[in-house]
A protein has these predicted regions:
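Core beta-strand elements of the Rossmann-like FAD/NAD(P) dinucleotide-binding domain
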Residues: 142-149
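Glycine-rich FAD pyrophosphate-binding loop
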Residues: 23-43
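N-terminal FAD cofactor-binding segment of flavoenzymes
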Residues: 43-82
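Short beta-strand to alpha-helix junction loop
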Residues: 56-59, 91-112
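N-terminal Rossmann-like FAD-binding beta1-loop-alpha1 element of flavoenzymes
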Residues: 4-28
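Central helical "cap/lid" subdomain
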Residues: 36, 149-195
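A conserved short coil-to-beta-strand element within the FAD-binding core of flavoproteins
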Residues: 121-135
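Single conserved hydrophobic/aromatic residue that forms the stacking wall/gate
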Residues: 230-237
Length: 237
């Protein structure tokens, strides 16, 4: 029987799994096809692809700075340079703001953390039971897993739905609404545009990333990740 079952392969889930794996048996499960959670990388062909979730990291706390510094030293992360166009008039620009990205994709952190751990994809947790101090986990694909301990690293609404029967916390009384963050993955003919990103001042269009500027690949087309949020779109209607 497993010592620990971790649900979610994002940065939090993968970091916890790596630490636990030093002393315990650990398996990780995720409903998606690949690793990364909110930092997923959409592969087009070979190394060519898009960061369609997390666009970059900009560490603030001392601990996270140490964490990213070590990953940069190990060439898991790198600095995203270039000309980043700051157009937003409601946010103050920080001159010391840095942008860190994965060397091959922004799911590189999770891949690195989970490289020696068994990961199961397309496993969406649908039901939880606890019997004789053992967690019985039922997935939508029909599989049932038993584990001594359970760690859930998934969005709040999903967590509340699955765990409110077993976990007593005032946090579940909070009314949390998660709005969609929509991203268009766009391919265009090669242009002379030399900007790495745009932080716009538009009510709908929030962010544009030039994926080619991340220097992970060379390609005869330009790749763009264009993002906006449900809230911004709703405000205009």
């Amino acid at each position: 029987m497993l010592d620990f079952c971790v649900i979610g392969t994002g940065i939090s889930g993968s970091t916890i799994a790596k630490l636990l794996n030093q002393k315990f048996s650990v398996n990780v499960y995720d409903k998606a096809k690949g690793i990364g959670g909110r930092s997923s990388f959409k592969r087009l062909n070979g190394k060519i692809g898009f960061d369609h979730g997390l666009q970059y990291l900009s560490p603030r706390s001392l601990k996270f700075k140490r964490f990213t510094k070590e990953l940069t030293r190990k060439k898991i992360l790198k600095f995203w340079g270039g000309n980043h166009k700051f157009l937003n008039k409601s946010v103050k620009k920080k001159n010391k703001h840095i942008k860190l990205i994965g060397v091959n994709g922004n799911n590189d952190i999770s891949k690195y953390q989970l490289k020696n751990i068994k990961c199961y994809h397309q496993y969406e947790l649908s039901k939880i039971n606890r019997l004789n101090k053992v967690w019985n986990l039922q997935f939508q694909n029909g599989q049932v897993i038993k584990s001594k301990n359970l760690i859930v690293s998934i969005p709040f609404p999903q967590c509340k739905k699955l765990l409110s029967k077993f976990v007593r916390t005032s946090l579940f009384k909070n009314k949390v609404i998660m709005n969609s963050s929509l991203t268009v993955l766009l391919m265009t003919n090669k242009t002379s545009n030399n900007y790495s990103s745009y932080f716009t001042n538009d009510k709908i269009l929030g962010w544009v990333s030039n994926e080619n500027s991340k220097k992970r690949f060379t390609y005869n087309k330009d790749l763009w990740a264009v993002s906006y949020t449900h809230l911004r779109a709703h405000e205009t209607t």
